A protein has these predicted regions:
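Residue-level recognition of the N-termini of beta-strands and the immediately preceding loop/turn
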Residues: 44-48, 132-135, 187
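Short, acidic Gly/Pro/Ser/Thr-rich loop/turn segments
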Residues: 57-58, 114, 142, 197
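Conserved active-site and cofactor/substrate-binding residues in soluble primary-metabolism enzymes
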Residues: 18-22, 51, 55, 59, ...
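Glycine-rich phosphate/diphosphate-binding loops and the adjacent beta-loop-alpha structural elements
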Residues: 45-46, 111-115, 195-196
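Glycine-rich phosphate/diphosphate-binding loop of Rossmann-like nucleotide-binding domains
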Residues: 26-110
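Fold-independent oxyanion-binding glycine-rich loops
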Residues: 1-3, 53, 87, 109-110, ...
Length: 253
C-alpha cells in the first residue's frame, strides 16, 4: 500500500486521518491515566512534541485538538500545546535535549529516508518526565538481519500490534529488542503496527471508497499487463506497487 502512489508520489490507498486519530486517542488517554493533575485547572498546558510534519503528523495535531476539546474545553482546563519538529530541528541534538525535558507526550510521526539511523536516541528518552508517554505512530520495526541494522526512529522502544499496543517500562517485549539497541531509559510506550485496525469499521469506510478504482483495473487486466504509461491513474499506481517496478528503480539507483 505504501507504494501505491500517484504521479506526484502521494499515496492513493491510505487513511492518514484514521491512522493518526486512533493512535492519538490511545496515547492521549494513556497519558490521562498517568500525568499528575491531568484534570486540574491549576496546571499549565500539556506539552506535546510531534516528530515530523507530513500528513500523519498533521492529522495527529488535529486529533490532539479534538480530544483536548472533549476533555478540557467546557471545563476551562488548559489544553495542549503542540510542537512539530522538522529535520532542521531533529538534526540538532542540543536542541532536542531541552525539548524532551518539556514534553509530556512524544509522538513519532516521522518518515525517514534512512531507517538505519535514530532520530531520538535512548539517552534523550532519559530527559522526558517520568510520567511522559511515547506514542509510536510510524511503528517502524527493528530488523537485525539487515546490514546495517534497521532501527526505529526512537531508540529502545518496542513495536506493538492490534493484540497489544501499550507497554509498561518493565514489559517482557523489551527482551525481544535486538541486543545492540540501548533500552536503558524507558517510558510508557503506545505503539501499533496497524493503527487503522484499532477502529476498523471507520477505516474500512475510507478504504472502500479508495479501492474501487484499483479493483476495476485488476478485474479487467492481468498483473503482467499493467502499464506505467497507461492513461488510467489507478493502473499507473498499481504498476508502481509491483516488484518489477521496485527492482527496476533499485537498479537505476
Amino acid at each position: 500500500m505504501d507504494s501505491m502512489v500517484d504521479d506526484d508520489g502521494v499515496r492513493m490507498l491510505v487513511n492518514y486521518k484514521g491512522t493518526s486519530r486512533s493512535a492519538v486517542k490511545a496515547g492521549f488517554y494513556e497519558l490521562k491515566k498517568r500525568m499528575p493533575k491531568f484534570m486540574s485547572k491549576e496546571r499549565g498546558p500539556i506539552k506535546v512534541t510531534i516528530i515530523g510534519m507530513g500528513f500523519v503528523a498533521q492529522q495527529a495535531a488535529k486529533a490532539l485538538e479534538e480530544f483536548s476539546d472533549i476533555e478540557f474545553l467546557e471545563k476551562e482546563i488548559p489544553g495542549v500545546v503542540v510542537r512539530m519538529l522538522p529535520r532542521t530541528i531533529t538534526n540538532h541534538y542540543n536542541l532536542l535535549e531541552e525539548i524532551m525535558k518539556n514534553t509530556d507526550l512524544l509522538i513519532d510521526a516521522s518518515k525517514r529516508l534512512d531507517t538505519t539511523k535514530y532520530i531520538v536516541s535512548n539517552k534523550l528518552i532519559g530527559y522526558l518526565p517520568q510520567s511522559a508517554v511515547i506514542l509510536d505512530i510510524s511503528a517502524d520495526p527493528y530488523n537485525d538481519k539487515l546490514n546495517p541494522v534497521q532501527v526505529k526512529a526512537i531508540e529502545g522502544i518496542p513495536t506493538g500490534n492490534l493484540e497489544k499496543y501499550i507497554f509498561e517500562t518493565d514489559d517482557i517485549s523489551y527482551e525481544g529488542i535486538p541486543k545492540a539497541v540501548d533500552t536503558t531509559n524507558r517510558r510508557v510506550v503506545v505503539s501499533c503496527s496497524a493503527w487503522p485496525g484499532v477502529d476498523p469499521k471507520d477505516c474500512m469506510k475510507v478504504y472502500d471508497k479508495q479501492i474501487k478504482g484499483f479493483l476495476d483495473v485488476l478485474l479487467k487486466k492481468d498483473l503482467d499487463c499493467l502499464d506505467i504509461n497507461s492513461e488510467n491513474a489507478f493502473e499507473r499506481s498499481l504498476y508502481r506497487s509491483t516488484l518489477k517496478y521496485y527492482q527496476g528503480n533499485k537498479e537505476d539507483k
